[in-house]
């Protein structure tokens, strides 16, 4: 817990809150840029000790900390404190950063982990923090999945892509079967968090067998029944109307040039219910035809409703 507040500090807080029934609101276009403009002139919050302000806002979220910077000059200065931002960093953050990397502050380190993912576990995963909440996000590399025919160069080839987070990604060459899956411990993720899971992929201009092909996908804890739904790597709006009984999750293009489709979700309780390993499944269950032209980056885990 944070530092306890003295009697004088608590009295000042009550005085400030009592004299400021309405605090001007500011929109935050980018959490990394802080809040809006600082309220001009003297603010009653300026009478609070800086360590008191830092202690208060350290119990909020990264988004709220950035917004609070616009309350007054005292708040704007207090939000730079390392003690605040260190609370938002994962406990293992020192092991995630190469020793040659130098950061000017814990705030600088926090936003670096948000916008510059790091490879962990010998390149098996890409790790970063969700900007507004500090929740952990993970992209599991395709090489950590089991892929039917994945080691057969007639069916799949492993290629280098400059836009990939990993050394190589698999490209489907020509195969009638499309089956892949894998599992991951939930210990690397944030506890008490509802996660959405996505398959991240690209389709090539030269492709066949994928158009409007329903792929059955699912996410669930190992040892439990896995809910099923469907995605389509190469979708046309007219054909998918013929799937009234299939729960089709729409794909969308990401800002990094990849495509993604949600394959399921789960709540990470840290294994309290006896399940701490989550499994994913991506299987074509409808077409025996030859297919080619899709590249798989991996499986991404991020807090639900996180963009």
UniProtKB/Swiss-Prot annotation:
Designated gene of the protein: PP2B6
Every copy of the F-box domain together lies at 42-88
Listed SUPFAM superfamilies: F-box domain
Can you say what this protein is called? Putative F-box protein PP2-B6
What terms describe the molecular function in GO for this protein?
carbohydrate binding
Source superkingdom:
Eukaryota
